[in-house]
Structures are given as C-alpha cells and as structure tokens.
C-alpha cells in the first residue's frame, strides 16, 4: 500500500514539474520569435483588416466594382481584407 502511494505521489510530482517546464519553454519560444507583433501592432493589424473590408463593402453598395484598396507597409488587399505579403 505504501509503495503504491509513493509511486502515485512521485508520478504527480514529475507531472507537475514537467508541466511547469513545458510552460516555461513555450513562453520562452514565444518571446524568442523574430518579428512577433506586440499588442499594439496586433491592434493595428486588426484595424487594417477592418478598413479594407469596409471600404470594399461601401464600393459594392454604390453599384461599383470593388477596387482593391492599397494597403501600405507590406500589406495588400485580398478577398476584401488586408493581408500580409
């Protein structure tokens, strides 16, 4: 009985340590990614998606063909949205 309890507690401790180490490693890998946008840039990216799709929706309502809006800074309009080139 004691051996089983010790084995269960040991497995639980190993699982906790492994999970903690995996979370730390994942956090480090996220921080190490080159070119990963921060929260401010992510908000700008969402605004670009919205701006391009709204622009095309307005043009369609006016019985005009949807002209591609020029997205700047490495972005282009595709399927009514700005996408990263």
Swiss-Prot record:
Localization terms from the record: Secreted
Record keyword Secreted present: yes
GO MF: toxin activity
Keywords: Disulfide bond, Neurotoxin, Postsynaptic neurotoxin, Secreted, Signal, Toxin
Organs and tissues of expression: Expressed by the venom gland.
Pfam families in alphabetical order: Toxin_20
Positions of the propeptide segment: 23-48
Covalent S-S links between cysteines: 52-66, 56-77, 71-82
Cellular component GO terms, alphabetical: extracellular region; host cell postsynaptic membrane
Signal sequence, renumbered to the chain: 1-22
Complex and partners: Monomer.
Role noted for this protein: Neurotoxin active on both insects and mammals.
Family the entry assigns: Belongs to the neurotoxin 12 (Hwtx-2) family. 02 (Hwtx-2) subfamily.
Name of the protein in its database record: U4-theraphotoxin-Hhn1a
Organism listed in the record: Cyriopagopus hainanus (Chinese bird spider)
């Amino acid at each position: 009985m004691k051996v089983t309890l010790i084995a269960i507690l040991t497995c639980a401790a190993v699982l906790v340590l492994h999970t903690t180490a995996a979370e730390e490693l994942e956090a480090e890998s996220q921080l190490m990614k080159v070119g990963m946008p921060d929260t401010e840039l992510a908000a700008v990216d969402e605004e670009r998606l919205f701006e391009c799709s709204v622009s095309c929706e307005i043009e369609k309502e006016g019985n005009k063909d949807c002209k591609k809006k020029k997205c700047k800074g490495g972005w282009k309009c595709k399927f009514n949205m700005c996408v990263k080139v």
